[in-house]
Amino acid sequence: MWYVSTRGIAPRVNFEGALFSGYAPDGGLFMPEELPQLDRKTLCQWSTLSYPGLVKELCALFIGSELIPKDELNDLIDRAFSRFRHREVVHLSRLRNGLNVLELWHGVTYAFKDLSLSCTAQFLQYFLEKREKHVTVVVGTSGDTGSAAIESVQGAKNMDIIVLLPKGHCTKIQELQMTTVLKENVHVFGVEGNSDELDEPIKTVFADVAFVKKHNLMSLNSINWSRVLVQMAHHFFAYFQCMPSLDTHPLPLVEVVVPTGAAGNLAAGYIAQKIGLPVRLVVAVNGNDIIHRTVQQGDFSLSEAVKSTLASAMDIQVPYNMERVFWLLSGSDSQVTRALMEQFERTQSVNLPKELHSKLSEAVTSVSVSDEAITQTMGRCWDENQYLLCPHSAVAVNYHYQQMDRQQPSTPRCCLAPASAAKFPEAVLAAGLTPETPAEIVALEHKETRCTPMRRGDNWMLMLRDTIEDLSRRWRSHALNTSR
């Protein structure tokens, strides 16, 4: 399986090449050159698989066995999920009035990113040990990515991780999950800015191809293909858990409601749809509504500023993975995609061509949900089910309630729940409810923290480059000492 850039200029790479890249050298994102097609028979066979079983099948489709033999791939995936709290890894809660909530948050950091990042870290370690190499992972986070990335690679001998977090823009628990990890391969910076601002120095550093190559830099943000690949399993599992029967022709549709920030989960769902999964995708966003405006009006443009909302991990203005969706919608036309994205990077505003917009609105429905609607949804779900939603999950469930109240004809529907309510006590209190906090999260309050400030007025890019160069020097000196 080969991977090509959405912008069509960078040379194609295999899975290992895509895994170790953030952006492609031409600024695009890697995508499979050809998508496999799943027939009815395969879908019927997969319908009885567990969540880890689905991850194994999907990864085997997109990672050649010449790179990772199937038995070894299965072992890596089992190892990735070994620390999850739920025996199913992912669990579907069936609640009143047809509300299905797929809990993607049973990993160590109580967020869905544990699923894709734990697998991605295993794949990285596999190749690094084989090649006797070291990488420095650079991550910008709006909340959950940083802690899940740190958790997945902390203590790894072939990897260092640098995380930039937006001070004051993620919850106290999210921040503590990052700053209390004191392993020597973990380096956390608290940035005086929002998540889009802290992405700028990262993007600038990654644009220096020679620097990236010299220091073996990579990203674990949602642009990494491996994360999108694993996230496809959410949609397959949601489908098989919620479909009424496989006996009908054609196979029944299931609506999957995807709370969306950087759109990695949406891209995964759209690829799942393209390879044969009969899902209808609903993008649910908070007040940062660029994707909603794109779906409704073809208006892919920045607002004046990021809005702080209760669903803080989705407070994102630039949903990078939409580039993957545009590329697929355009029939893998890299010229169209490159022109769109370069205009967006230049002017922060693009009106989608009519044909592209029409294809997008056929493939995806969207909804934007206010903070008031988030807290109302959390309250209603508790009243009806004694079930606590996190604010991001409430964005998805709000769509379900809207459809139910309008008495729309009922397609089976699954709402993805990206995080546990335990991570967002402030939002739970705002909804007039009582937070439930697990002991591991309470314990964070009493742990030692480590975090280097990046203040307004500091040269963030220079600080980042200096840290990377220092880590490279340390690794070279370590490698020299161990080879003697």
Curated annotation (Swiss-Prot):
Gene3D superfamilies: 3.40.50.1100, Threonine synthase, N-terminal domain (3.90.1380.10). It is an enzyme of class 4 (lyase). SUPFAM superfamilies: Tryptophan synthase beta subunit-like PLP-dependent enzymes. It comes from Pongo abelii. Its EC number is 4.2.3.-. GO terms for biological process: 2-oxobutyrate biosynthetic process; serine family amino acid catabolic process. InterPro entries: Thr_synth_N, Thr_synth_N_sf, Thr_synthase-like, Threonine_Synthase, TrpB-like_PALP, TrpB-like_PALP_sf. The modification N6-(pyridoxal phosphate)lysine is found at residue 113. The keyword Chaperone does not apply. Belongs to the threonine synthase family. GO terms for molecular function: lyase activity; pyridoxal phosphate binding. Acts as a catabolic phospho-lyase on both gamma- and beta-phosphorylated substrates. Degrades O-phospho-threonine (PThr) to alpha-ketobutyrate, ammonia and phosphate. CDD domains: Thr-synth_2 (cd01560). The keyword Lyase applies. It holds the Pfam family PALP. It comes from the Eukaryota. Keywords: Lyase, Pyridoxal phosphate. Its cofactor is pyridoxal 5'-phosphate. This is Threonine synthase-like 2.
